[in-house]
Protein backbone atom coordinates (compact mmCIF):
# COMPACT_ATOMS: atom_id res chain seq x y z
CA UNK A 1 0.00 0.00 0.00
CA UNK A 2 2.73 2.46 1.00
CA UNK A 3 4.84 1.72 -2.08
CA UNK A 4 1.79 1.96 -4.32
CA UNK A 5 0.74 5.27 -2.77
CA UNK A 6 4.20 6.73 -3.15
CA UNK A 7 4.21 5.77 -6.80
CA UNK A 8 0.79 7.23 -7.47
CA UNK A 9 1.06 10.55 -5.75
CA UNK A 10 2.37 13.34 -7.94
CA UNK A 11 0.79 16.02 -5.87
CA UNK A 12 -0.93 18.87 -7.66
CA UNK A 13 -0.26 18.00 -11.24
CA UNK A 14 3.26 16.77 -11.06
CA UNK A 15 4.51 19.38 -8.68
CA UNK A 16 8.01 18.05 -9.09
CA UNK A 17 7.78 16.97 -12.71
CA UNK A 18 5.78 19.64 -14.51
CA UNK A 19 7.22 21.83 -17.20
CA UNK A 20 6.42 25.11 -18.89
CA UNK A 21 6.13 25.77 -22.60
CA UNK A 22 8.32 28.83 -22.30
CA UNK A 23 11.33 29.21 -20.04
CA UNK A 24 11.07 31.60 -17.13
CA UNK A 25 11.70 35.25 -17.67
CA UNK A 26 13.94 36.07 -14.72
CA UNK A 27 12.35 39.41 -13.92
CA UNK A 28 12.92 39.12 -10.14
CA UNK A 29 10.86 42.27 -9.75
CA UNK A 30 10.69 42.21 -5.97
CA UNK A 31 14.39 41.62 -5.46
CA UNK A 32 15.20 44.38 -7.92
CA UNK A 33 12.85 46.69 -6.06
CA UNK A 34 14.51 46.17 -2.68
CA UNK A 35 17.54 44.43 -1.23
CA UNK A 36 17.59 42.84 2.21
CA UNK A 37 19.14 46.02 3.57
CA UNK A 38 16.35 48.08 1.98
CA UNK A 39 13.77 45.82 3.61
CA UNK A 40 15.42 46.21 7.01
CA UNK A 41 15.12 49.98 6.82
CA UNK A 42 11.68 50.02 5.18
CA UNK A 43 9.64 47.79 7.48
CA UNK A 44 7.27 49.77 9.69
CA UNK A 45 8.05 49.11 13.35
CA UNK A 46 5.73 48.13 16.18
CA UNK A 47 3.00 46.91 13.83
CA UNK A 48 2.01 50.48 13.03
CA UNK A 49 1.10 49.34 9.52
CA UNK A 50 -2.04 47.69 10.92
CA UNK A 51 -5.01 49.93 10.17
CA UNK A 52 -7.63 47.90 12.05
CA UNK A 53 -8.74 48.97 15.55
CA UNK A 54 -7.34 47.25 18.62
CA UNK A 55 -9.78 44.79 20.15
CA UNK A 56 -10.45 47.12 23.09
CA UNK A 57 -11.27 50.07 20.82
CA UNK A 58 -15.00 49.44 20.77
CA UNK A 59 -15.91 52.74 19.14
CA UNK A 60 -13.38 51.96 16.44
CA UNK A 61 -14.89 48.54 15.78
CA UNK A 62 -18.44 49.90 15.77
CA UNK A 63 -17.39 52.32 13.06
CA UNK A 64 -15.33 49.74 11.21
CA UNK A 65 -17.93 46.95 11.00
CA UNK A 66 -20.78 49.45 10.61
CA UNK A 67 -23.66 47.86 8.68
CA UNK A 68 -22.01 44.42 8.86
CA UNK A 69 -21.84 44.28 12.66
CA UNK A 70 -25.15 42.51 13.21
CA UNK A 71 -24.50 40.02 10.42
CA UNK A 72 -21.06 39.10 11.76
CA UNK A 73 -22.34 38.72 15.32
CA UNK A 74 -25.20 36.48 14.20
CA UNK A 75 -22.75 34.15 12.45
CA UNK A 76 -20.85 33.81 15.71
CA UNK A 77 -24.00 33.22 17.75
CA UNK A 78 -24.70 30.15 15.62
CA UNK A 79 -21.35 28.72 16.74
CA UNK A 80 -21.70 29.32 20.48
CA UNK A 81 -22.74 25.71 21.05
CA UNK A 82 -20.56 24.23 18.33
CA UNK A 83 -19.09 20.84 19.23
CA UNK A 84 -15.48 20.79 18.11
CA UNK A 85 -14.81 17.85 15.83
CA UNK A 86 -11.97 15.39 16.24
CA UNK A 87 -10.17 14.47 13.04
CA UNK A 88 -9.53 10.78 13.62
CA UNK A 89 -6.50 8.81 12.48
CA UNK A 90 -8.77 6.76 10.23
CA UNK A 91 -10.00 9.97 8.61
CA UNK A 92 -6.45 10.71 7.50
CA UNK A 93 -5.85 7.12 6.41
CA UNK A 94 -9.00 7.15 4.29
CA UNK A 95 -6.99 8.95 1.63
CA UNK A 96 -4.79 5.89 1.29
CA UNK A 97 -7.53 3.28 1.45
CA UNK A 98 -10.25 4.81 -0.75
CA UNK A 99 -8.66 7.96 -2.18
CA UNK A 100 -11.20 10.20 -0.42
CA UNK A 101 -9.95 13.45 1.06
CA UNK A 102 -13.41 14.65 2.06
CA UNK A 103 -13.60 12.36 5.10
CA UNK A 104 -10.71 14.21 6.71
CA UNK A 105 -11.48 17.66 5.34
CA UNK A 106 -15.13 17.87 6.42
CA UNK A 107 -14.62 17.93 10.21
CA UNK A 108 -11.43 19.98 9.89
CA UNK A 109 -13.10 22.60 7.70
CA UNK A 110 -16.12 22.66 10.01
CA UNK A 111 -13.87 23.58 12.92
CA UNK A 112 -12.12 26.32 10.94
CA UNK A 113 -15.43 27.84 9.83
CA UNK A 114 -16.73 27.89 13.38
CA UNK A 115 -13.54 29.46 14.71
CA UNK A 116 -13.45 32.18 12.06
CA UNK A 117 -17.12 33.04 12.67
CA UNK A 118 -16.47 33.31 16.41
CA UNK A 119 -13.41 35.52 15.98
CA UNK A 120 -15.18 38.00 13.70
CA UNK A 121 -18.21 38.02 16.00
CA UNK A 122 -16.07 38.87 19.03
CA UNK A 123 -14.20 41.59 17.17
CA UNK A 124 -17.56 43.06 16.15
CA UNK A 125 -19.32 42.81 19.53
CA UNK A 126 -16.45 43.02 22.02
CA UNK A 127 -18.32 41.81 25.10
CA UNK A 128 -16.32 38.64 25.66
CA UNK A 129 -19.14 36.15 25.21
CA UNK A 130 -17.43 34.43 22.28
CA UNK A 131 -14.01 34.22 23.97
CA UNK A 132 -14.57 30.85 25.72
CA UNK A 133 -15.51 29.16 22.44
CA UNK A 134 -12.59 30.83 20.67
CA UNK A 135 -10.31 29.42 23.37
CA UNK A 136 -11.83 25.97 22.84
CA UNK A 137 -11.22 26.21 19.11
CA UNK A 138 -7.67 27.45 19.52
CA UNK A 139 -6.89 24.75 22.08
CA UNK A 140 -8.36 21.99 19.95
CA UNK A 141 -6.42 23.21 16.91
CA UNK A 142 -3.16 23.30 18.85
CA UNK A 143 -3.73 19.70 19.96
CA UNK A 144 -3.75 18.44 16.36
CA UNK A 145 -0.65 16.64 15.11
CA UNK A 146 -0.70 18.63 11.88
CA UNK A 147 -2.60 21.48 10.27
CA UNK A 148 -2.08 20.03 6.79
CA UNK A 149 -4.65 18.11 4.75
CA UNK A 150 -4.39 14.36 4.28
CA UNK A 151 -4.09 14.83 0.51
CA UNK A 152 -1.00 16.98 1.05
CA UNK A 153 0.63 15.00 3.85
CA UNK A 154 1.88 12.48 1.31
CA UNK A 155 4.73 14.91 0.62
CA UNK A 156 6.07 14.14 4.08
CA UNK A 157 9.23 12.08 4.20
CA UNK A 158 7.05 9.12 5.22
CA UNK A 159 4.95 9.48 2.03
CA UNK A 160 1.91 8.60 4.12
CA UNK A 161 -1.35 10.46 4.73
CA UNK A 162 -1.20 10.20 8.54
CA UNK A 163 0.61 13.14 10.16
CA UNK A 164 4.18 12.40 11.21
CA UNK A 165 4.80 14.24 14.47
CA UNK A 166 8.50 14.41 13.62
CA UNK A 167 7.88 16.72 10.67
CA UNK A 168 5.95 19.96 10.27
CA UNK A 169 4.46 20.31 6.81
CA UNK A 170 3.32 23.73 5.62
CA UNK A 171 0.60 23.33 3.01
CA UNK A 172 -2.24 25.65 2.00
CA UNK A 173 -4.35 24.91 5.06
CA UNK A 174 -1.50 24.94 7.55
CA UNK A 175 -0.50 28.30 6.14
CA UNK A 176 -4.07 29.60 6.28
CA UNK A 177 -4.35 28.49 9.89
CA UNK A 178 -1.01 30.03 10.73
CA UNK A 179 -2.12 33.36 9.29
CA UNK A 180 -5.56 33.22 10.90
CA UNK A 181 -4.22 32.21 14.31
CA UNK A 182 -1.55 34.92 14.13
CA UNK A 183 -4.33 37.49 13.81
CA UNK A 184 -6.23 35.71 16.60
CA UNK A 185 -3.16 35.95 18.82
CA UNK A 186 -2.63 39.60 17.89
CA UNK A 187 -6.19 40.61 18.76
CA UNK A 188 -6.92 38.35 21.75
CA UNK A 189 -3.75 37.24 23.54
CA UNK A 190 -4.42 39.56 26.49
CA UNK A 191 -8.02 38.35 26.68
CA UNK A 192 -6.80 34.75 26.70
CA UNK A 193 -4.43 35.61 29.55
CA UNK A 194 -7.40 36.65 31.68
CA UNK A 195 -8.56 33.03 31.58
CA UNK A 196 -5.12 31.44 31.76
CA UNK A 197 -1.76 32.66 30.38
CA UNK A 198 -0.92 29.17 29.15
CA UNK A 199 -3.47 29.55 26.33
CA UNK A 200 -1.69 32.36 24.51
CA UNK A 201 1.70 30.82 25.30
CA UNK A 202 0.60 27.51 23.80
CA UNK A 203 -0.74 29.23 20.70
CA UNK A 204 2.40 31.32 20.24
CA UNK A 205 4.64 28.27 20.59
CA UNK A 206 2.56 26.30 18.10
CA UNK A 207 2.90 29.09 15.57
CA UNK A 208 6.64 29.19 16.14
CA UNK A 209 7.08 25.43 15.85
CA UNK A 210 4.65 24.77 13.00
CA UNK A 211 5.10 27.88 10.83
CA UNK A 212 7.86 30.35 11.65
CA UNK A 213 10.76 27.97 12.24
CA UNK A 214 10.03 25.48 9.43
CA UNK A 215 9.67 28.24 6.85
CA UNK A 216 13.10 29.65 7.61
CA UNK A 217 14.81 26.32 8.21
CA UNK A 218 13.56 24.45 5.17
CA UNK A 219 14.02 25.18 1.49
CA UNK A 220 12.47 21.97 0.22
CA UNK A 221 8.78 22.82 0.38
CA UNK A 222 8.03 22.48 -3.32
CA UNK A 223 5.94 25.65 -3.40
CA UNK A 224 8.87 27.80 -2.21
CA UNK A 225 10.44 27.12 -5.63
CA UNK A 226 13.87 28.19 -4.41
CA UNK A 227 15.48 25.57 -6.64
CA UNK A 228 13.16 26.17 -9.60
CA UNK A 229 14.69 25.49 -12.98
CA UNK A 230 13.64 27.38 -16.13
CA UNK A 231 11.08 24.66 -16.86
CA UNK A 232 9.69 24.16 -13.33
CA UNK A 233 6.01 24.88 -12.75
CA UNK A 234 5.23 27.37 -9.98
CA UNK A 235 1.50 27.62 -9.32
CA UNK A 236 -1.00 29.22 -6.94
CA UNK A 237 0.50 27.51 -3.90
CA UNK A 238 3.45 29.89 -4.05
CA UNK A 239 1.75 33.27 -3.52
CA UNK A 240 -0.91 31.69 -1.31
CA UNK A 241 1.57 30.11 1.11
CA UNK A 242 3.98 33.04 1.02
CA UNK A 243 1.20 35.48 1.82
CA UNK A 244 0.49 33.43 4.92
CA UNK A 245 4.17 33.30 5.86
CA UNK A 246 4.48 37.06 5.44
CA UNK A 247 1.43 37.60 7.65
CA UNK A 248 2.80 35.37 10.40
CA UNK A 249 6.20 37.06 10.49
CA UNK A 250 4.79 40.57 10.40
CA UNK A 251 2.44 39.84 13.29
CA UNK A 252 4.60 37.60 15.47
CA UNK A 253 8.31 38.24 15.00
CA UNK A 254 9.60 40.89 17.40
CA UNK A 255 13.25 40.75 16.30
CA UNK A 256 13.54 43.27 13.43
CA UNK A 257 16.54 41.53 11.84
CA UNK A 258 14.85 38.12 11.84
CA UNK A 259 11.65 39.69 10.57
CA UNK A 260 13.41 41.42 7.68
CA UNK A 261 15.19 38.21 6.68
CA UNK A 262 11.89 36.33 6.65
CA UNK A 263 10.16 39.06 4.64
CA UNK A 264 12.96 39.07 2.09
CA UNK A 265 12.80 35.28 1.88
CA UNK A 266 9.13 35.54 0.90
CA UNK A 267 10.10 38.10 -1.76
CA UNK A 268 12.66 35.72 -3.24
CA UNK A 269 10.04 32.98 -3.35
CA UNK A 270 7.19 35.06 -4.81
CA UNK A 271 9.55 36.29 -7.51
CA UNK A 272 9.64 32.67 -8.69
CA UNK A 273 5.86 32.76 -9.22
CA UNK A 274 5.97 36.06 -11.08
CA UNK A 275 8.86 34.77 -13.19
CA UNK A 276 6.85 31.68 -14.11
CA UNK A 277 3.89 33.71 -15.33
CA UNK A 278 3.85 35.16 -18.81
CA UNK A 279 3.97 38.88 -19.51
CA UNK A 280 0.49 38.62 -21.05
CA UNK A 281 -0.95 37.85 -17.60
CA UNK A 282 -2.93 34.74 -18.56
CA UNK A 283 -3.70 32.32 -15.73
CA UNK A 284 -3.23 28.80 -17.05
CA UNK A 285 -5.00 27.45 -13.95
CA UNK A 286 -8.19 29.24 -14.99
CA UNK A 287 -10.58 31.79 -13.43
CA UNK A 288 -11.61 29.65 -10.46
CA UNK A 289 -7.95 29.45 -9.40
CA UNK A 290 -7.24 33.11 -10.11
CA UNK A 291 -8.29 34.18 -6.62
CA UNK A 292 -5.55 32.06 -5.10
CA UNK A 293 -3.01 32.64 -7.86
CA UNK A 294 -2.89 36.24 -9.08
CA UNK A 295 -5.48 37.21 -6.46
CA UNK A 296 -3.39 35.91 -3.61
CA UNK A 297 -0.29 37.46 -5.18
CA UNK A 298 -2.16 40.76 -4.94
CA UNK A 299 -2.87 40.15 -1.22
CA UNK A 300 0.82 39.42 -0.72
CA UNK A 301 1.96 42.53 -2.60
CA UNK A 302 -0.57 44.71 -0.78
CA UNK A 303 0.48 43.43 2.62
CA UNK A 304 4.14 43.92 1.71
CA UNK A 305 3.42 47.46 0.57
CA UNK A 306 1.48 48.18 3.76
CA UNK A 307 4.28 46.84 5.95
CA UNK A 308 6.91 48.97 4.18
CA UNK A 309 4.78 52.10 3.91
CA UNK A 310 4.68 51.70 0.13
CA UNK A 311 8.45 51.53 -0.29
CA UNK A 312 8.41 47.94 -1.57
CA UNK A 313 5.69 47.95 -4.23
CA UNK A 314 5.60 46.68 -7.81
CA UNK A 315 2.00 47.51 -8.69
CA UNK A 316 3.29 49.72 -11.51
CA UNK A 317 4.73 46.74 -13.39
CA UNK A 318 2.73 45.83 -16.56
CA UNK A 319 2.72 42.09 -15.83
CA UNK A 320 1.04 42.68 -12.46
CA UNK A 321 -1.75 44.66 -14.13
CA UNK A 322 -2.10 42.08 -16.90
CA UNK A 323 -2.40 39.25 -14.38
CA UNK A 324 -5.19 41.15 -12.66
CA UNK A 325 -7.20 42.09 -15.74
CA UNK A 326 -7.29 38.46 -16.90
CA UNK A 327 -10.14 37.76 -14.46
CA UNK A 328 -12.37 40.48 -15.94
CA UNK A 329 -11.67 39.48 -19.53
CA UNK A 330 -12.39 35.80 -18.80
CA UNK A 331 -15.93 36.54 -17.66
CA UNK A 332 -18.64 35.55 -20.15
CA UNK A 333 -21.77 36.66 -18.28
CA UNK A 334 -24.51 35.43 -15.94
CA UNK A 335 -21.93 33.77 -13.71
CA UNK A 336 -20.21 31.83 -16.51
CA UNK A 337 -16.48 32.10 -17.12
CA UNK A 338 -14.01 30.74 -19.63
CA UNK A 339 -12.82 27.54 -18.03
CA UNK A 340 -9.90 25.46 -19.18
CA UNK A 341 -8.17 22.67 -17.24
CA UNK A 342 -9.49 22.13 -13.69
CA UNK A 343 -11.27 25.48 -13.53
CA UNK A 344 -15.02 25.48 -12.95
CA UNK A 345 -17.32 26.94 -15.60
CA UNK A 346 -19.18 28.91 -12.92
CA UNK A 347 -17.74 31.76 -10.92
CA UNK A 348 -16.50 35.24 -11.56
CA UNK A 349 -14.25 35.83 -8.60
CA UNK A 350 -14.39 37.63 -5.27
CA UNK A 351 -15.56 41.16 -5.92
CA UNK A 352 -13.62 42.69 -3.04
CA UNK A 353 -10.27 41.26 -4.11
CA UNK A 354 -10.84 42.20 -7.75
CA UNK A 355 -11.79 45.75 -6.77
CA UNK A 356 -8.78 46.32 -4.53
CA UNK A 357 -6.43 44.77 -7.07
CA UNK A 358 -7.92 47.09 -9.69
CA UNK A 359 -7.34 50.09 -7.46
CA UNK A 360 -3.72 49.09 -6.88
CA UNK A 361 -2.90 48.71 -10.59
CA UNK A 362 -5.22 51.54 -11.71
CA UNK A 363 -7.47 49.29 -13.78
CA UNK A 364 -10.94 50.72 -14.32
CA UNK A 365 -11.96 47.45 -16.01
CA UNK A 366 -11.28 45.50 -12.83
CA UNK A 367 -12.99 48.01 -10.56
CA UNK A 368 -16.07 48.22 -12.79
CA UNK A 369 -16.18 44.44 -13.13
CA UNK A 370 -16.06 44.04 -9.35
CA UNK A 371 -18.96 46.48 -9.03
CA UNK A 372 -20.82 44.45 -11.66
CA UNK A 373 -20.41 41.27 -9.62
CA UNK A 374 -22.15 42.96 -6.71
CA UNK A 375 -24.82 44.95 -8.52
CA UNK A 376 -25.87 42.26 -11.00
CA UNK A 377 -25.15 38.99 -9.24
CA UNK A 378 -25.16 39.89 -5.55
CA UNK A 379 -22.34 37.47 -4.77
CA UNK A 380 -20.15 40.29 -3.56
CA UNK A 381 -22.45 41.20 -0.66
CA UNK A 382 -20.89 38.43 1.43
CA UNK A 383 -17.88 40.19 2.94
CA UNK A 384 -16.94 37.22 5.14
CA UNK A 385 -13.96 35.38 3.62
CA UNK A 386 -13.92 32.69 6.31
CA UNK A 387 -10.50 31.84 7.68
CA UNK A 388 -8.91 34.43 5.38
CA UNK A 389 -9.35 37.17 7.96
CA UNK A 390 -7.21 39.64 5.99
CA UNK A 391 -9.65 39.51 3.09
CA UNK A 392 -12.62 39.83 5.42
CA UNK A 393 -11.18 42.92 7.09
CA UNK A 394 -10.20 44.43 3.74
CA UNK A 395 -13.64 43.65 2.28
CA UNK A 396 -15.25 45.60 5.10
CA UNK A 397 -12.86 48.53 4.78
CA UNK A 398 -13.39 48.96 1.04
CA UNK A 399 -17.04 48.00 0.68
CA UNK A 400 -18.44 51.53 0.46
CA UNK A 401 -15.99 52.48 -2.28
CA UNK A 402 -16.87 49.34 -4.18
CA UNK A 403 -20.64 49.82 -4.14
CA UNK A 404 -20.23 53.43 -5.26
CA UNK A 405 -18.28 52.38 -8.36
CA UNK A 406 -20.07 52.23 -11.70
CA UNK A 407 -20.77 48.64 -12.70
CA UNK A 408 -19.71 47.47 -16.16
CA UNK A 409 -18.21 44.56 -18.05
CA UNK A 410 -15.09 45.06 -20.17
CA UNK A 411 -15.96 46.33 -23.64
CA UNK A 412 -13.15 44.59 -25.51
CA UNK A 413 -14.26 42.53 -28.54
CA UNK A 414 -11.31 40.19 -28.17
CA UNK A 415 -8.54 39.24 -25.77
CA UNK A 416 -5.34 37.60 -26.92
CA UNK A 417 -2.71 36.08 -24.65
CA UNK A 418 0.22 35.40 -26.99
CA UNK A 419 2.45 33.57 -24.51
CA UNK A 420 -0.25 31.67 -22.61
CA UNK A 421 -1.97 31.13 -25.98
CA UNK A 422 -5.54 31.86 -24.92
CA UNK A 423 -7.87 33.61 -27.37
CA UNK A 424 -11.31 35.14 -26.68
CA UNK A 425 -13.55 36.76 -29.30
CA UNK A 426 -17.05 38.25 -29.18
CA UNK A 427 -19.62 39.17 -31.83
CA UNK A 428 -22.39 41.73 -31.85
CA UNK A 429 -25.02 38.98 -32.11
CA UNK A 430 -24.16 37.39 -28.77
CA UNK A 431 -21.49 34.80 -29.56
CA UNK A 432 -18.53 34.48 -27.19
CA UNK A 433 -15.70 32.23 -28.37
CA UNK A 434 -12.77 31.01 -26.29
CA UNK A 435 -9.93 28.72 -27.37
CA UNK A 436 -6.46 27.71 -26.32
CA UNK A 437 -3.30 26.25 -27.80
CA UNK A 438 -0.57 25.67 -25.22
CA UNK A 439 0.81 22.31 -24.16
CA UNK A 440 -0.26 19.25 -22.22
CA UNK A 441 1.62 19.76 -18.96
CA UNK A 442 0.17 23.04 -17.75
CA UNK A 443 -0.83 23.60 -14.15
CA UNK A 444 -3.97 21.56 -13.40
CA UNK A 445 -3.54 20.20 -16.90
CA UNK A 446 -6.08 18.56 -19.16
CA UNK A 447 -5.05 17.17 -22.54
CA UNK A 448 -6.75 19.98 -24.43
CA UNK A 449 -4.41 21.62 -26.94
CA UNK A 450 -6.61 23.42 -29.48
CA UNK A 451 -9.94 23.05 -27.69
CA UNK A 452 -12.64 25.75 -27.68
CA UNK A 453 -15.87 26.76 -25.99
CA UNK A 454 -18.82 28.66 -27.47
CA UNK A 455 -21.49 30.68 -25.69
CA UNK A 456 -24.63 32.36 -27.02
CA UNK A 457 -25.98 35.26 -24.99
CA UNK A 458 -23.76 34.06 -22.12
CA UNK A 459 -25.20 30.53 -22.29
CA UNK A 460 -22.54 27.79 -22.65
CA UNK A 461 -23.54 25.46 -25.48
CA UNK A 462 -20.27 23.89 -26.62
CA UNK A 463 -18.46 23.47 -23.36
CA UNK A 464 -15.37 22.61 -21.39
CA UNK A 465 -16.61 20.19 -18.73
CA UNK A 466 -14.10 21.01 -15.99
CA UNK A 467 -13.14 18.58 -13.25
CA UNK A 468 -14.93 16.39 -10.74
CA UNK A 469 -14.35 16.09 -7.01
CA UNK A 470 -10.67 15.85 -6.17
CA UNK A 471 -9.50 12.43 -5.01
CA UNK A 472 -6.16 10.66 -4.77
CA UNK A 473 -6.58 9.62 -8.40
CA UNK A 474 -6.83 13.25 -9.55
CA UNK A 475 -3.23 14.00 -8.64
CA UNK A 476 -1.61 10.68 -9.45
CA UNK A 477 -0.33 8.81 -12.47
CA UNK A 478 -3.96 7.70 -12.93
CA UNK A 479 -5.10 11.26 -13.67
CA UNK A 480 -5.58 10.70 -17.38
CA UNK A 481 -7.74 7.66 -16.83
CA UNK A 482 -10.37 10.18 -15.65
CA UNK A 483 -12.63 10.91 -18.61
CA UNK A 484 -12.82 14.69 -18.13
CA UNK A 485 -9.03 15.01 -18.40
CA UNK A 486 -8.86 13.32 -21.79
CA UNK A 487 -8.80 15.12 -25.13
CA UNK A 488 -11.54 12.83 -26.43
CA UNK A 489 -13.90 14.59 -23.98
CA UNK A 490 -12.89 18.04 -25.20
CA UNK A 491 -13.80 19.75 -28.45
CA UNK A 492 -11.03 18.11 -30.39
CA UNK A 493 -10.36 15.44 -33.02
CA UNK A 494 -9.37 11.87 -32.32
CA UNK A 495 -6.87 11.52 -35.14
CA UNK A 496 -6.65 8.03 -36.60
CA UNK A 497 -9.00 7.18 -33.73
CA UNK A 498 -6.48 8.22 -31.04
CA UNK A 499 -6.46 11.07 -28.45
CA UNK A 500 -3.80 13.54 -27.34
CA UNK A 501 -1.10 12.64 -24.82
CA UNK A 502 0.09 14.12 -21.53
CA UNK A 503 3.52 15.72 -21.41
CA UNK A 504 5.36 18.98 -22.01
CA UNK A 505 6.50 17.78 -25.42
CA UNK A 506 2.89 17.49 -26.61
CA UNK A 507 2.18 21.04 -27.69
CA UNK A 508 0.84 23.33 -30.38
CA UNK A 509 2.90 25.10 -32.99
CA UNK A 510 2.30 27.82 -35.58
CA UNK A 511 -0.13 29.55 -33.22
CA UNK A 512 -1.50 32.74 -34.80
CA UNK A 513 -4.23 35.22 -33.92
CA UNK A 514 -5.39 37.78 -36.48
CA UNK A 515 -7.41 40.40 -34.66
CA UNK A 516 -8.55 42.09 -37.89
CA UNK A 517 -9.89 38.93 -39.51
CA UNK A 518 -11.01 37.40 -36.20
CA UNK A 519 -9.07 34.20 -36.90
CA UNK A 520 -7.28 31.97 -34.39
CA UNK A 521 -5.27 29.09 -35.81
CA UNK A 522 -2.79 26.45 -34.72
CA UNK A 523 -1.22 23.16 -35.71
CA UNK A 524 -2.20 20.65 -33.02
CA UNK A 525 -0.44 17.62 -34.52
CA UNK A 526 2.33 17.91 -31.95
CA UNK A 527 -0.13 17.21 -29.13
CA UNK A 528 -0.52 13.62 -30.36
CA UNK A 529 1.92 10.74 -29.96
CA UNK A 530 3.97 9.24 -32.79
CA UNK A 531 1.55 6.31 -32.91
CA UNK A 532 -1.13 8.65 -34.27
CA UNK A 533 0.89 9.03 -37.49
CA UNK A 534 -0.08 12.65 -38.10
CA UNK A 535 2.17 15.19 -39.85
CA UNK A 536 -0.03 18.26 -39.55
CA UNK A 537 -3.49 19.06 -38.22
CA UNK A 538 -4.09 22.73 -38.79
CA UNK A 539 -7.25 24.02 -37.17
CA UNK A 540 -8.57 27.49 -37.96
CA UNK A 541 -11.32 29.22 -36.00
CA UNK A 542 -12.96 32.21 -37.68
CA UNK A 543 -15.65 34.19 -35.87
CA UNK A 544 -17.82 36.64 -37.81
CA UNK A 545 -21.17 38.04 -36.68
CA UNK A 546 -23.02 37.21 -39.91
CA UNK A 547 -21.53 33.74 -40.42
CA UNK A 548 -21.02 32.62 -36.84
CA UNK A 549 -18.04 30.38 -36.10
CA UNK A 550 -16.36 28.51 -38.94
CA UNK A 551 -13.92 25.76 -38.00
CA UNK A 552 -11.60 24.36 -40.63
CA UNK A 553 -9.43 21.28 -40.06
CA UNK A 554 -6.73 20.75 -42.69
CA UNK A 555 -4.63 17.63 -42.15
CA UNK A 556 -1.94 15.33 -43.45
CA UNK A 557 -1.45 11.81 -42.09
CA UNK A 558 1.54 9.54 -42.54
CA UNK A 559 -0.64 6.46 -42.70
CA UNK A 560 -4.17 5.28 -41.97
CA UNK A 561 -5.19 3.35 -38.85
CA UNK A 562 -8.76 4.25 -37.97
CA UNK A 563 -11.45 6.81 -38.74
CA UNK A 564 -10.98 10.39 -37.58
CA UNK A 565 -13.56 11.40 -34.99
CA UNK A 566 -14.38 15.05 -34.31
CA UNK A 567 -15.86 15.57 -30.84
CA UNK A 568 -17.97 18.39 -29.45
CA UNK A 569 -18.98 18.44 -25.78
CA UNK A 570 -22.44 19.95 -25.40
CA UNK A 571 -24.71 20.95 -22.54
CA UNK A 572 -27.90 20.59 -24.55
CA UNK A 573 -28.95 17.30 -26.12
CA UNK A 574 -27.96 17.24 -29.82
CA UNK A 575 -30.85 17.09 -32.26
CA UNK A 576 -29.75 14.99 -35.26
CA UNK A 577 -33.07 14.99 -37.11
CA UNK A 578 -31.58 16.71 -40.16
CA UNK A 579 -28.60 15.18 -41.94
CA UNK A 580 -25.69 17.63 -42.05
CA UNK A 581 -27.12 19.83 -39.31
CA UNK A 582 -27.14 19.47 -35.53
CA UNK A 583 -29.26 21.67 -33.28
CA UNK A 584 -27.89 22.22 -29.77
CA UNK A 585 -30.29 23.98 -27.43
CA UNK A 586 -30.31 24.81 -23.74
CA UNK A 587 -32.78 27.00 -21.91
CA UNK A 588 -34.15 28.60 -25.11
CA UNK A 589 -30.67 29.39 -26.48
CA UNK A 590 -29.83 27.37 -29.57
CA UNK A 591 -27.11 27.03 -32.17
CA UNK A 592 -26.90 25.01 -35.37
CA UNK A 593 -23.74 23.07 -36.16
CA UNK A 594 -23.48 22.38 -39.88
CA UNK A 595 -21.19 19.74 -41.37
CA UNK A 596 -20.80 17.96 -44.70
CA UNK A 597 -22.90 14.77 -44.51
CA UNK A 598 -20.77 13.17 -47.21
CA UNK A 599 -17.79 13.42 -44.83
CA UNK A 600 -19.29 12.31 -41.53
CA UNK A 601 -21.76 10.14 -39.68
CA UNK A 602 -23.14 12.01 -36.66
CA UNK A 603 -24.06 10.44 -33.33
CA UNK A 604 -23.79 11.31 -29.67
CA UNK A 605 -23.06 9.79 -26.28
CA UNK A 606 -25.01 10.56 -23.12
CA UNK A 607 -22.64 11.14 -20.21
CA UNK A 608 -24.39 10.89 -16.81
CA UNK A 609 -23.05 13.29 -14.18
CA UNK A 610 -22.86 11.48 -10.86
CA UNK A 611 -20.10 13.64 -9.37
CA UNK A 612 -21.64 16.52 -7.42
CA UNK A 613 -18.86 18.95 -8.35
CA UNK A 614 -19.90 18.56 -11.99
CA UNK A 615 -23.64 17.97 -11.56
CA UNK A 616 -23.92 21.17 -9.50
CA UNK A 617 -22.81 23.02 -12.62
CA UNK A 618 -24.26 20.98 -15.48
CA UNK A 619 -27.10 18.94 -14.04
CA UNK A 620 -27.71 15.22 -14.51
CA UNK A 621 -26.13 14.66 -17.90
CA UNK A 622 -23.90 16.02 -20.65
CA UNK A 623 -23.45 14.97 -24.26
CA UNK A 624 -20.60 14.21 -26.61
CA UNK A 625 -21.45 14.89 -30.24
CA UNK A 626 -19.34 12.69 -32.51
CA UNK A 627 -18.68 13.28 -36.19
CA UNK A 628 -17.05 10.08 -37.44
CA UNK A 629 -15.34 10.25 -40.82
CA UNK A 630 -16.86 8.01 -43.48
CA UNK A 631 -13.64 7.82 -45.46
CA UNK A 632 -10.08 7.15 -44.37
CA UNK A 633 -7.86 9.62 -46.22
CA UNK A 634 -4.29 10.76 -45.64
CA UNK A 635 -4.94 14.37 -46.59
CA UNK A 636 -8.11 16.36 -46.40
CA UNK A 637 -10.09 19.31 -45.14
CA UNK A 638 -13.11 19.29 -42.84
CA UNK A 639 -15.30 22.33 -42.29
CA UNK A 640 -17.94 22.94 -39.63
CA UNK A 641 -20.04 26.06 -39.23
CA UNK A 642 -21.84 27.04 -36.03
CA UNK A 643 -24.47 29.79 -36.14
CA UNK A 644 -27.20 31.01 -33.78
CA UNK A 645 -30.53 29.34 -34.53
CA UNK A 646 -33.09 31.84 -35.76
Listing of model-derived features with the role each one plays in the protein:
Residues 76-88, 134-152, 201-226, 261-281, ...:
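Long, well-ordered core segments of solenoidal/helical folds
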Residues 47-49, 99-111, 123, 158-174, ...:
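Solvent-exposed loop and edge beta-strand segments that line ligand/cofactor-binding
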Residues 1-26:
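Bacterial Sec-dependent N-terminal signal peptides
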Residues 24-96:
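Low-complexity, Ser/Thr/Pro/Gly-enriched N-terminal "stalk/linker" regions
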Residues 160-286, 393, 400-406:
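Active-site lining segments of carbohydrate-active enzymes
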Residues 110-122, 169-186, 234-250, 290-302, ...:
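Well-ordered alpha-helical segments within folded domains of soluble proteins
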Residues 294-461, 513-514, 632:
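Carbohydrate-active enzyme catalytic cores, enriched for enzymes
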Residues 23-24, 154, 175, 373-374, ...:
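CBM-like, beta-strand-rich accessory domains located in the C-terminal region of large
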